[in-house]
């Protein structure tokens, strides 16, 4: 199965969610590494939303840099977003922004660490998505 590519800050919320999925996954580095992540196969991006509800800063800068590489951007096939419902209309805004800019489906969204139901839904949805692609 193709991997998830994900970003998680030092809070590790997104990382903990990805671990529960038990799916192949590659993490976009937080910082401090000179080597850029370059993917070699199609992937689904899993991204948290930041910025406190503002479109400015909603997508983590590390994710922007990753997607600014034309090779990486050419392999994205879908996006899943984590967010906080306290942000109102900006809940999971990073997923909406990336879906629109990269013209890929916005597959799922979940709050903070996600629930057991979110884990089941994402695992099933990702598996079915790749089956339809092949």
Swiss-Prot record:
GO terms, molecular function: FMN binding
- Disulfides per UniProt: none
Tell me the function of this protein.
Probably involved in ribonucleotide reductase function.
Q: Which NCBIfam families does the record match to this protein?
A: nrdI
Family membership: Belongs to the NrdI family.
Q: Which Pfam families match?
A: Flavodoxin_NdrI
Source lineage:
Bacteria, Pseudomonadati, Pseudomonadota, Gammaproteobacteria, Enterobacterales
Under which name does UniProt file this protein?
Protein NrdI
GO biological process terms on file? protein modification process
């Amino acid at each position: 199965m193709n991997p998830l590519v994900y970003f998680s800050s030092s809070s590790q919320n997104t990382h903990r969610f990805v671990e529960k999925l038990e799916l192949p996954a590659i993490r976009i580095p937080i910082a401090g590494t000179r080597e850029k992540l370059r993917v070699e196969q199609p992937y689904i991006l899993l991204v948290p939303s930041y910025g406190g509800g503002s479109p400015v800063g909603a997508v983590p800068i590390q994710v922007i840099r990753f997607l600014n590489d034309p090779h990486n951007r050419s392999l994205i096939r879908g996006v899943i977003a984590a967010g906080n419902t306290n942000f109102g209309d900006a809940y999971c805004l990073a997923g909406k922004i990336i879906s629109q800019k990269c013209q890929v489906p916005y597959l799922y969204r979940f709050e903070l660490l996600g629930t057991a139901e979110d884990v089941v839904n994402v695992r099933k949805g990702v598996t079915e998505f790749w089956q339809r692609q092949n």
